[in-house]
From Swiss-Prot:
Entry's Gene Ontology BP terms: monoatomic ion transport
The protein's name: Vitamin B12 transporter BtuB
Entry keyword set: Calcium, Cell outer membrane, Ion transport, Membrane, Metal-binding, Porin, Signal, TonB box, Transmembrane, Transmembrane beta strand, Transport
Signal peptide (from-to): 1-20
Motif (TonB box): 26-33
Highest taxon in the source lineage: Bacteria
Function: Involved in the active translocation of vitamin B12 (cyanocobalamin) across the outer membrane to the periplasmic space. It derives its energy for transport by interacting with the trans-periplasmic membrane protein TonB.
Gene Ontology cellular-component annotations: cell outer membrane; pore complex
């Protein structure tokens, strides 16, 4: 970790009087520019979620955490473990870069988009969420934003947790962190989660085979980490985790053919790193390996039957990141190397393929009086489509003490996935999707209210669409996204309020029709308070209407799904200094709604849990 005093000196954050009041570790951000900096110095909109937030919200999935955040819209085909799409500021789910401890999520390489319905929430210790373009820093996918899930734990001791709930939900978790001598720390986490689920396919003509069954989810997770401090300036770590998930779902059925309605996912990841932390220079070298095997099969025949499908991918990464204090700011530079290897049949690609990418980036941030300037540039050399460059720049002006205006522009891109390149309908001549984004924002601190209002536009060209007539993928799509985002947080006595509002006009720029499964308006509100040691929380979420396709009709038709207001209620009580009991009612008023046409949501659900620390 970079020493806090060094950071404060480097950025002279005392100039930002409205935003520099809190200097706790939770206000330091690494994801925005790939070097640690106070959140007040980040010009892009950023949200930080801590483990304490997740426990207070009593979230049982990563999707439940993310749906509370500004700009995030999630469409899911049912309940726990079912396929989901994350839309940030109206962009495609493939335009969201998901990192695990700064490393690209392995499963995104197969489909081209990250589905976090399978990732265990028990591993999440912190989330850094950046909105807007970040390809100039991270490369492909970072068009709508970046979600960095951090698993590093900083909570010595042992915690046992057990929970039960609706639909036969069960969760058992043990985590421990212990010192092994003066300079070594070990962490171990084990987690088991199970739910019988519910029948995810909605009743009525949806084009699906009627399967009146429960679609359950089972997940087993193991995590281990070892950290060692060699000296005041040198430290290192090694960690690994794996999870074994089984998901039941409803699928299309053809008479005389096996019914493929079960998913089995094995995933493991390992990484090791070495850090140097000088007074003015910081450097980190990280090497990682991940391997996933994703089966879809008929349980009557098993996952090794010829009717089953297997998506198998190995991913190798090496990252070298550096930053140096220059003037009143930092300059960062680094190299990313990645290799993805697939087996034959993965993503319906007949042959196995290797894809390599080497990226070189440069970032800089300077504070000049009342102005903060930020810029980044990156060049990627890909074994498939060659070299591609991106850049971005931002400027912030504190025109009155406590009030700042921010303007930014950035380019970003999305590389074609393996299925689009080499699948049965693939096109090896595809080019990356390209984006240009503009944003203007005001932020300030007024009468104890910390607020930000942003307006943005995103033009995406060369989008990869499937051509029904030519039966191939081509770069023929365009999207135009305009939006307004407003956020605020404040306290009134014992009450803590967090509010956000999003207006997103995401359209196909060729046909001028709305992009599917996105709400045009979203409003979110979180209220927390303590009364006589009871920690209460109320969550409100309004999701506006959205459009989707009805495939039960031929040709398929576009349907409009209405908006919905959802309420959650949580409470926690510390029975002793070691034992805490928690309860939650999700979807308090049992609203019936869909985010994917034809797929039901859970309705009202109850959970009760307890945790014991020692």
């Amino acid at each position: 970790m970079i020493k806090k005093a060094t950071l404060l000196t480097a950025f002279s954050v005392t100039a930002f009087s409205a935003w520099a009041q809190d200097t706790s570790p939770d206000t330091l951000v690494v994801t925005a520019n790939r070097f640690q900096q106070p959140r007040s110095a980040v010009l892009a909109p950023v949200t930080i979620v801590t483990r304490q937030d997740i426990e207070r919200w009593q979230s049982t999935s990563v999707n439940d955490v993310l749906r509370r955040l500004p700009g995030v819209d999630i469409a899911q085909s049912g309940g726990a473990g079912q396929n989901s799409s994350i839309f940030i500021r109206g962009t495609n789910s493939s335009h969201v870069l998901v990192l695990i401890d700064g490393v690209r999520l392995n499963l995104a390489g197969v489909s081209g988009s990250a589905d976090l319905s399978q990732f265990p929430v028990s591993l999440v210790q912190r989330i850094e969420y950046i909105r807007g373009p970040r390809s100039a820093i991270y490369g492909s996918d970072a068009i709508g934003g970046v979600v960095n899930i951090i698993t590093t734990r900083d909570n010595p001791g042992t915690e046992l947790t057990a929970g039960w709930g609706s639909n036969s939900y069960q969760n058992y978790d043990i985590s421990t962190q212990q010192q092994l001598g003066e300079n070594t720390r070990a962490t171990l986490i084990g987690d088991y989660e199970y739910t019988k689920g519910f029948d995810v396919v909605a009743k009525g003509g949806t084009g699906m085979q009627a399967q009146p069954d429960r679609d359950g989810f089972l997940s087993k997770t193991l995590y281990g980490a070892l950290e060692h401090t060699f000296s005041d300036r040198w430290s290192g770590f090694v960690r690994g985790y794996g999870y074994d998930n089984r998901t039941d779902y409803d699928a299309y059925y053809s008479p005389g053919s096996p019914l493929i309605d079960t998913r089995k996912l094995y995933s493991q990841s390992w990484d090791a790193g070495l850090r140097f932390n000088g007074e003015r220079i910081q450097s980190q070298l990280v090497s990682s390996y991940s391997h996933s095997k994703d089966y879809n099969y008929d349980p009557h025949y098993g996952r090794y039957d010829t009717s089953a499908t297997l998506d198998e991918m190995k991913q190798y990464n090496v990252q070298w990141t550096n930053s140096v204090v220059v003037g009143h700011g930092n300059v960062g530079a680094g190299v990313d190397w990645q290799k993805q290897t697939t087996t034959p049949g993965t993503g319906y690609v007949p042959e196995g393929y290797d894809q390599r990418n080497t990226g070189v980036y440069l970032t800089g941030l300077q504070q000049l009086g009342d102005f903060t300037l930020e810029a980044a540039a990156r060049s990627d050399d890909n074994s498939q489509f060659g070299r591609h460059g991106t850049w971005q720049t931002s400027a912030g002006w504190e025109f009155i003490e406590g009030y700042r205006f921010i303007a930014s522009y950035g380019t970003s891109y999305k590389a074609p996935n393996l299925g689009q390149l080499y699948g049965y309908y693939g096109n090896p001549n595809l080019n990356p999707e390209k984006s240009k984004q503009w944003e203007g924002a005001f932020e300030g601190l007024t009468a104890g209210v910390s607020w930000r209002i942003s307006g943005y536009r995103n033009d995406i060209n060369d989008m990869i669409d499937y051509d029904d007539h030519l039966q191939k993928y081509y770069n023929e799509g365009k999207a135009r996204i305009k939006g307004i985002e407003a956020t605020a947080n404040f306290d009134t006595g014992p009450l803590t309020h967090t509010v956000s509002y999003d207006y997103v006009d995401a359209r196909n720029a060729i046909t001028d029709t709305p992009l599917p499964r996105r709400s045009k308006q979203m409003a979110k509100y979180q209220l927390d308070w303590d009364v006589y040691d009871f920690d209460w929380g109320v969550t409100y979420q309004y999701l506006g209407s959205r459009y989707d396709s009805d495939y039960s009709a031929y040709p398929y038709r576009t349907v409009k799904m209405g908006g919905v207001s959802l309420w959650d209620l949580t409470v926690a009580y510390p029975v002793t200094s070691h034992l805490t009991v928690r309860g939650k009612i999700a979807n308090l008023f049992d609203k019936d709604y869909e985010t994917v046409y034809g797929y039901q949501t859970a309705g009202r659900e109850y959970t009760l849990s307890g945790s014991y620390t020692f």
